[in-house]
């Protein structure tokens, strides 16, 4: 989302969010909310009172489950850490802190406003308020990073970590300054082999501290510490995104059709549309049966627990899933068997269940390209 110069009117944006929330949730009042996730930007810059209004409004429209997970993403600046207790009072139950790295020079190049020491202090503060419900985000594969430096940083973060870690490999998006710098050879990232070693080091070090690797980039100390919200994405559940650039996947109650929607990215145009017509949706597209099947496999095999044939055939319980063939008929079985023999996939029965091995999870994108018709 593009934020206009001079900042935004918090009250106006909150009212736009509430309008979009009402329009989006009203058709689903027979459901319950399993999770709410404030992310995609820096939601911790919002006023806690406005976060509370959004949670209360959502709960009035579609009741929150008794054990609903309500996460807030935050950067560990002193201003945001100072609001942590107020966010808990507003209804936040889980706190996700974007440490990224402990290298202060890299944080400066990223434009981050915190130091590595402040990142660790924020984790300690969050643990006191959200014990067992704190996640730390770290990144690897950036310029100048070495395997030994990554191992040292991760060991230090693990000394402070609570129950969940998200460890992301740096991705370079086309059109970004980093993309242009790479093409001009002004920046050199670690070689692919070095980044693979960093990934393997993360699995090793987290495992030694009791963090189970349950998804490509995610580690949890117990099943209860896994991100309920993100698991919803990977398991093909319905989600509704509110706000500029937000994406949604849900089944339309009227037609039974699975839909994909994207909100308008420009924050001013999005807010104006919300106030005038109740939502800022820019695109709506029906997801056909072929795409729904592909998504089920792509998302399901991002998890170490994988995908069962029953889950695949059930789909999202919408009309596009009716009559879906078994996994063994959908996938290229010759290639699946080869990856099983090579130790990248594991399966039971006649593909009653399919999952990546730890080794396979590291190269799952190339495996998916090979087994999906």
Model region roles, listed by residue range:
Residues 111, 349, 368:
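Short, flexible helix/strand-to-coil boundary loops that buttress conserved ligand/catalytic motifs
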Residues 2-27, 31-326:
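C-terminal scaffold of the Radical SAM
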Residues 352-357:
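Minor-groove-contacting beta-hairpin "wing" of winged helix-turn-helix DNA-binding domains
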Residues 337-351:
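A short, conserved structural fragment
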Residues 358-373:
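Short, amphipathic alpha-helical interaction segments positioned at domain boundaries
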Residues 321-341:
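Short amphipathic alpha-helical interaction segments
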């Amino acid at each position: 989302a593009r934020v206009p110069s001079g900042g935004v009117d918090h009250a106006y944006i909150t009212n736009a969010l509430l309008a979009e929330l009402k329009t989006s949730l009203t058709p689903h009042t027979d459901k319950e909310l399993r999770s709410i996730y404030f992310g995609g930007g820096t939601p911790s810059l919002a006023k806690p009172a406005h976060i509370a209004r959004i949670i209360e409004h959502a709960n009035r429209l579609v009741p929150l489950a008794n054990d609903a997970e309500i996460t807030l993403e935050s950067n560990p600046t002193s201003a945001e850490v100072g609001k942590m207790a107020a966010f808990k009072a507003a209804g936040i139950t889980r706190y996700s802190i974007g440490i990224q790295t402990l290298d202060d020079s890299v944080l400066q190049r990223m434009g981050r406003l915190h130091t590595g020491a402040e990142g660790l202090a924020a984790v300690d503060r969050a643990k006191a308020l959200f014990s067992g419900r704190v996640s730390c985000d770290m990144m690897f594969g950036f310029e100048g990073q070495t395997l030994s430096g990554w191992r040292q940083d991760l060991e230090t973060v693990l000394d402070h970590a609570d129950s969940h870690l998200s460890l992301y490999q740096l991705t370079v998006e086309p059109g970004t300054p980093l993309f242009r710098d790479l093409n001009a050879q002004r920046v050199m990232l670690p070689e692919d082999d070095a980044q693979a070693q960093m990934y393997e080091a993360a699995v090793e070090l987290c495992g030694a501290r009791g963090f189970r690797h349950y998804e490509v980039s995610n580690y949890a100390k117990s099943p209860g510490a896994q991100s309920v919200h993100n698991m919803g994405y990977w398991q093909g559940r319905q989600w509704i995104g509110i706000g500029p650039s937000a994406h949604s996947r849900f089944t339309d109650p009227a037609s039974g059709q699975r839909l994909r929607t994207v909100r308008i990215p420009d924050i001013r145009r999005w807010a104006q549309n919300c106030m005038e017509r109740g939502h800022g949706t820019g695109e709506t597209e029906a997801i056909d049966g072929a795409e729904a099947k592909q998504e089920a496999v792509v998302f399901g095999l991002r998890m170490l627990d994988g995908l069962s044939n029953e889950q695949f055939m059930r789909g999202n319980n919408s009309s596009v899933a009716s009559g879906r063939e078994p996994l063994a008929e959908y996938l290229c079985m010759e290639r699946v068997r080869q990856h099983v023999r090579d130790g990248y996939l594991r399966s039971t029965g006649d593909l009653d269940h399919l999952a990546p091995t730890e080794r396979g999870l590291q190269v799952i994108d190339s495996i998916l390209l090979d087994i999906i018709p």
